[in-house]
């Protein structure tokens, strides 16, 4: 399903997964990291976690949805997670979560689709959170919890 290209950066070898619809670059992109000059490049282990997240959740979801999905937030280094005021044990830091938004802008329809898709297809995951902050909405989708479990939690969350 994916091809791997190994990159040598500051003698650490990192994996670059190329899936049909997602890239490592996209999963690590952050405007806040750019603005605050925060290094948000993952280790080899975290890149492999992002690959697993993509292979098991993101790409199958994108294929089922059959329309582009934007990753608003994927991997976050500890410094970036602190900058965005993420929870201390956020699995974004481990490469096991992504905040998603459908490119067509139909976030409520997308949220219902994801909920139905995980239920009907018995998809293994940790959390499916429908998050909102003011008028902004997104879907948080994680593969594992910080303890490695898959709790299959589905919640609505208001972020302050």
Spans of features found by a protein language model:
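Catalytic cores and adjacent binding grooves of peptidoglycan-active enzymes
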Residues: 12, 102-160
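Single, functionally critical "micro-switch" positions that shape active/binding sites
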Residues: 76, 91, 141
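Extracytoplasmic cell-surface/polysaccharide-interacting catalytic and binding patches
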Residues: 6-62, 151, 155-160
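Acidic, His- and aromatic-enriched active-site or binding-groove loops in soluble protein domains
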Residues: 88-109
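Structural recognition of the beta-strand scaffold that forms the well-ordered cores
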Residues: 70-72, 97-101, 140-142
């Amino acid at each position: 399903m994916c091809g791997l290209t190994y990159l040598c950066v500051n003698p650490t070898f990192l994996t670059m997964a190329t899936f049909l619809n997602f890239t490592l670059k996209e999963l690590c992109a952050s405007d806040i990291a750019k603005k605050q000059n925060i290094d948000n490049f993952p280790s080899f282990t975290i890149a492999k976690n992002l690959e697993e997240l993509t292979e098991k959740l993101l790409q199958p979801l994108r294929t089922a949805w059959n329309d582009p999905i934007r990753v608003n937030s994927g991997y976050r280094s500890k410094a970036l997670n602190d900058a965005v005021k993420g929870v201390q044990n956020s699995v974004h830091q481990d490469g096991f979560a992504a905040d998603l938004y459908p490119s067509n802008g139909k976030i409520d329809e997308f949220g219902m689709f994801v909920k139905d898709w995980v239920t009907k297809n018995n998809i293994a995951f940790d959390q499916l959170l429908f998050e909102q902050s003011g008028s902004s909405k997104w879907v948080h989708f994680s593969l594992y919890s910080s303890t490695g479990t898959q709790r299959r939690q589905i919640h609505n969350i208001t972020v302050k």
